[in-house]
Swiss-Prot record:
Residues 92-96 are annotated as: G2. It is an enzyme of class 2 (transferase). One of its GO terms (molecular function) is sulfate adenylyltransferase (ATP) activity. HAMAP family: Sulf_adenylyltr_sub1 (MF_00062). This is Sulfate adenylyltransferase subunit 1. GTP binds at residues 34-41, 113-117, 168-171. InterPro entries: CysN_GTP-bd, CysN_II, CysN_NoDQ_III, G_TR_CS, GTP-eEF1A_C, P-loop_NTPase, Small_GTP-bd, SO4_adenylTrfase_lsu. With CysD forms the ATP sulfurylase (ATPS) that catalyzes the adenylation of sulfate producing adenosine 5'-phosphosulfate (APS) and diphosphate, the first enzymatic step in sulfur assimilation pathway. APS synthesis involves the formation of a high-energy phosphoric-sulfuric acid anhydride bond driven by GTP hydrolysis by CysN coupled to ATP hydrolysis by CysD. Keywords: ATP-binding, GTP-binding, Nucleotide-binding, Nucleotidyltransferase, Transferase. Heterodimer composed of CysD, the smaller subunit, and CysN. Residues 34-41 are annotated as: G1. Its EC number is 2.7.7.4. The lineage of its organism: Bacteria, Pseudomonadati, Pseudomonadota, Gammaproteobacteria, Enterobacterales. It comes from Salmonella gallinarum (strain 287/91 / NCTC 13346).
């Protein structure tokens, strides 16, 4: 066991008390990105090493692996802690997205180490989709490169609001303050084209030597700011989903016996309480929450991010892919939308093509109507194209086979994000983020027969405890 971990457990009074303390720590998900060979994997290895998160057997294996695959001579090659694929070690690059977990006294962390090579940009987008913060590494010798711009744009496109620009390999430029200042100015000039609500910070460091990673550097006394670890421990993450209206995509209908019917899923945004009136989309049927069931027992209220099962007071038709929201919320299903797309397939995306799309638990078919433009990553300008190539990013107009309950991605990533699936190979070929909604072709108002209206009025008059909805409620309100 890691001796530091053993000491922490002892200080907390045992394993159970230590685990409870861990559960109450805040969690930060972040990714490392940047151009190839900027030192992303080495930086993560340094963080794990300097925060004493490496076990004795891992350290022993690292010594052996450094001799066989290392690129740092007699020094430990810390990148080998995260470059686990054989191809990665042979080529000295990152290919897949590698996830690592560690914690300090202040916070828990999940790290996504993403590839720097352009052909693996799709892997980088996958890693960024769940993160709150991005560390953008820049080689102090090379400055801002195309991949730096590409990864910055993709990160912000996927909703990342906190960017830490880590100017790495300062040891190779003699810890020069002028080099740091020049790269900082270059990046800020580029960042003027990014969304204006970003939190951008700069840290000069050397992942190989450990300068300004977990401890202040004696070689850069001109820098008085926080270390990288201090930034990660103290950054205030405000998740938009906590402030958004309640959205609950149904992932599974749980029916273990005749006495229980629950709707399982993860609460995408907002909160829900027992007794609250809810509405089901696309049907529009209403009910109220009878129970909120979790692994640890029933709750009175659940918040965004919690995995729950909702039990309703009425037996109504709800299937996987339906969306539950507050009864007083208005969300009109749409068949047409403009989608920001990151294309991940060798075959280009072109108008006229059809794909399966998956949104939360909902799966349907969509047709590409037009490509408005492709983004030139070098200068973030828009250009007209006939198709979107591998790793291309652009704005695409789509039509769905059926109306979908969608949100704008920047407001709610779960109900505003989707993936494209090839219908023949079942391979994921693209990621989409809803930019604009067009309600053309949305579900038209329902016309009820005279018999249905009379029956509805009869039920509401004689059985008020059924809470039946007034089918003419909207028209009565207008009158």
């Amino acid at each position: 066991m890691n001796t530091i971990l053993a000491q922490q457990i002892a200080n907390e009074g045992g394993v159970e008390a230590w685990m409870i303390a861990q559960q109450h720590k805040s969690l930060l998900r972040f990714l490392t990105c940047g151009s190839v060979d900027d030192g992303k994997s080495t930086l993560i290895g340094r963080l794990l090493h300097d925060t004493l998160q490496i076990y004795e057997d891992q350290l022993s294996s690292l010594h052996n692996d450094s001799k066989r695959h290392g690129t740092q001579g007699e020094k430990l090659d810390l990148a080998l802690l995260v470059d686990g694929l054989q191809a990665e070690r042979e080529q000295g690059i990152t290919i897949d997205v590698a996830y690592r977990y560690f914690s300090t006294e202040k916070r828990k962390f999940i790290i996504a180490d993403t590839p720097g090579h352009e052909q693996y940009t799709r892997n980088m987008a996958t890693g960024a989709s769940t993160c709150d913060l991005a560390i953008l590494l820049i080689d102090a010798r090379k400055g801002v490169l195309d991949q730096t711009r590409r990864h910055s744009f993709i990160s912000t496109l996927l909703g990342v609001k906190h960017l830490v620009v880590a100017i790495n390999k300062m040891d190779l430029v003699d810890y020069c303050e002028e080099t740091f200042a020049r790269i900082r100015e270059d990046y800020l000039t580029f960042a003027e084209q990014l969304p204006g609500d970003l939190d951008i910070r700069f840290v000069p460091l050397s992942a190989l030597e450990g300068d300004n990673v977990a401890a202040q550097s004696a070689n850069m006394r001109w820098y008085s700011g926080p270390t990288l670890l201090e930034v990660l421990e103290t950054v205030d993450i405000q998740r938009a989903v906590d402030r958004q209206p309640m959205r609950f995509p149904v992932q599974y209908v749980n029916r273990p016996n005749l006495d229980f019917r629950g709707y399982a899923g993860t609460l995408a945004s907002g909160s829900v309480k027992v007794g609250e009136r809810i509405k089901v989309l696309p049907s529009g049927v209403e009910s109220s929450v009878a129970r909120i069931v979790t692994f640890d027992g029933d709750k009175e209220e659940a918040c965004a991010g919690e995995a729950i099962t909702l039990v309703l007071n009425d037996d109504i038709d709800i299937s996987r892919g339906d969306l539950l929201l507050a009864a007083n919320e208005t969300l009109a299903p749409a068949r047409h939308a403009a989608i920001d797309v990151v294309w991940m397939a060798e075959q280009p995306l072109a108008p006229g093509q059809s794909y399966d799309v998956k949104l939360a638990g909902k799966k349907t078919r969509a047709r590409i109507e037009a490509i408005r433009y492709q983004i030139d990553i070098n200068n973030l300008t828009q250009r007209d194209v006939e198709s979107l190539p591998l790793n291309g990013i652009g704005l695409v107009e789509m039509t769905f086979d059926e109306p979908l309950a969608l949100d704008i991605y920047q407001q709610n990533p779960v109900t505003g994000g989707l993936i494209f699936i090839d219908r023949l190979s079942n391979v994921t070929v693209g990621a989409g983020m809803v930019r604009e909604l067009d309600e053309r072709g949305a579900t038209p108002p329902v016309e009820y027969s005279a018999f249905e209206l009379e029956l509805n009025a009869l039920v509401r008059r004689h059985f008020p405890h059924w809470d039946a909805r007034d089918l003419l409620g909207d028209k009565h309100g207008a009158a």
